[in-house]
Structure formats: structure tokens, C-alpha cells
Amino acid sequence: YEFRYREADFGNFPRGLMYGLQMFDSWLYDDEKPFIHVEELKTFAFLKEQIGSGYFEELIQKYILDNPHGAIVVIKPEKGRTARLDKELAERLQEYKKSLSEAEVEKIVADTKELIAYQEEPSTKEELEAIPVLEIEDISKEIAPIYNEELHLADTLVVHHDVETNGISYLSLMFDLSDVPEEQLPYVGILQSVIGMIDTNNYAYGELFNEINMSTGGIGTSLEVYPNVTKVSEKEFKAAFEVKTKALYDKLPVAFQMIRELLMESKFEDEKRLEEILALLKSRLQMKFQSSGHMTAVLRAMSYRSPMSQFKDLTNGIAFYEKVCKIADHFEEEKAALIMNLKKLSEQIFRADNMIISCTSRKEGLEELEKLIRELKNGIYQGTADHTPCILHCEKKNEGFQTASKVQYVARTGNFMEE
């Protein structure tokens, strides 16, 4: 909570606006206490003093364990529900139509045509000109300042961004994926989903989550792609397995310790947990495809011609989903290969010579960084791997995918840089 208070990240909302709204939580009820919800450091200090005094145990006992008010809500899936509801709706509409006279049916048809015509009617010039727009003179020609300084700490490239962060260091450890073979890329997507969600040799994954969040603002993993803007026609890009964390300066040692724990101590041989993660991953991908079908269709269509989109499709798109389904649905037959590939990829990716770091902080945030990087490099995989560049094969297709959604998405893509 103290970390979130210091970070004050309100997403797209202006910080001043959110502080103003927080003030009303007390100001509306006491004119003399408008700032108690924005001056929270004293509250954090008080709560720290109560550790070990029984204060928190009493709160839990009174307001949770002994609370007489509660509710249990169960949501159960029903196979074929959409088809059943569609059939019931069709039957109700048919019965309703039978109850109408011929004139009433004709009126509904006419009203529908009028509505469609109204919706498709283009806006007039006067209506379009009434929409507020920015003039070209309103847009600054100056780019925002870029704070990039290349450093070499512990023989590792560190790109430092010196900006005010209120005592927080934002770190991104980037491991190059350019030498991972194409057929292994779906396993990279699974590896990214497994790390942090499975036990390690020293922690159960729930304990690890608590340990990380007690001392840092979290540790997350992602797969990122960066197009080479100087070689657009060659379609070159860089792909990286990124481990991101944010922590107060004095908590950076814990952050690096936990990163090493995730990368080196994860128990990929835990078959039961792997099966659970795959089932969860399969479900989340299905929900993502249904909630953003337009993006799914565009990515798949782009993968026919773009190596970068092909990479995304293999690690987080339809091709990735098909691989996840195959492993999840035939887990007993696939588990040995899955475990072997996760271990093999970890050794190939998380190497000391395969890492660069991005750090956003003030200069004082760098004081211990070189020592921490050296300790991390000594604790992860050593040696070099086969630096054979991965060549992605794009194949033009014409395909469709069926879902339970009532909305259809059709995508046609191309590259304006090509003839």
C-alpha cells in the first residue's frame, strides 16, 4: 500500500483529479480534515508499529471471522446455453408474430427500414463542422524529451532513464529471443504464463506471490516485440522475454532475489500444477478471443505476411491457442515433452550473456545496481547458446473460426509499404 501511495499511478486519470476526489472522502464530513486521505505516510508508520501487537488479529476477528453477515454466490457453466436461449427467443418471436395483424407486421418492417436508413445516413457538413477539433497550430512540433543513457554495469548493457520516480526504481530485464526456433515459440508463450504461477524450490507459488508483493510493486513477465524502424522493408524486429519489477531503492535486493527465484528455481516438473495452469490459460485465451475478436482476426490475418505478427500469433494468438489446447486436452501424452521444453528454453533464454536492462530512476537508484546485476548474473545460466537466427515462415491462408459469439469479425490486411 505504501508503494502504491508513493507511485500514485492512476492510469489515464489526472493525478490532481484523483487526489481531489480522495479529499472529499473526509472533507464532506469534517471541514477541518480535508487531507487525511492524501497524507497517508503517518498512517503507514502507525500500522507498521502495530505489527506483533495483536492489532491486526483483532480487526480480522471482529470484522471478518465473527461477522454475521455474508453471502455465497455460485456461478455454474451450462453447455449449450447460447443455442438454448436462441431457440427460446426464436419461439417467442414466432408466437409474437402470430399475434400481430398483417398491418402491424408491415409497420414493424417499415420502421426497421427507416431506422437502418437513419443509421446509415451520412452526417451533414454542418454537423461535422460542429465537432471540436484541434488545429495543426495547436500541436507542438517539439518531441517530448528522451532520457536515455547507456551504461555498462557488471559487463551488462543498462539503459538508464533519469526521471523523478519518488524513490522508486522501475526495472525491465530483457532476454533476447532471436535464436529460439519457430517450433519452440508456443512453448515460450507457455513458459511466460507458467513463471510466477508455479511452486519454486523454496516457496509455494502463493507464498512467493506474498513475498514479492510485501517488498516490491510486483514482478511480471511478458513477451515483447520491437520493429526495426530503419529496416521496415526487410520486416526486421527484435523479440524479448521481459521480466519487469518496480521497488523502492532499499528493496531492490529483494526484487533481484525474487527474480532469480522465478527464473532458476521454478518446479516445472509439478505436473498437477502445470495441468491447472494450462486449463486456466486455455480459458483466458477463449475469453480474450471473444471479447476482442476484431484484434484476434487482424493478428491472424497479419500473420500471413508479417513475421512479427507471426511471432505474436505463435506466442499469444490462435496458433498459440491451438497448441495450448493440444497439450491441455492430451496432457498425459504431452506432459513429458512440455516439461522438457520448459527446462530447455529456460536454459537457453535466461543466460547471463543474453540480458540487457532498462532502469528508470534517479541517479541514486543506481548506487547498488551494479552489485545486484553481478550477483544475478552469477546466479543464472552461464555459457553461450547457438546463435542461429530464427526464421519465421509466413503462409497465406483463407480461414474462419467458429465461436459462441453472436458477432462476426472479418479482417482483410495488407502492408502499405509493399506494392
Positions of predicted regions on the chain:
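M16 family metallopeptidases and their MPP-like homologs
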Residues: 1-48, 68-78, 84, 166-265, ...
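A diffuse structural propensity rather than consistent per-protein peaks
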Residues: 52, 132-135, 204, 270, ...
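His/Glu-based metal-binding/catalytic segments typifying zinc-dependent metallopeptidases
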Residues: 13-37, 99-196, 354, 358, ...
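Ordered core of a single globular domain
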Residues: 28-112, 325-384
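Flexible helix-coil linker/hinge segments at domain or subdomain boundaries
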Residues: 269-273, 383-386
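Alpha-helix boundary/capping residues
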Residues: 1, 54, 63, 112, ...
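Sterically constrained small-residue positions within well-ordered secondary structures
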Residues: 64, 162-164, 234-236, 348, ...
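Short beta-strand/turn micro-motifs at beta-sheet edges
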Residues: 159-161, 221-233, 344-346, 398-401
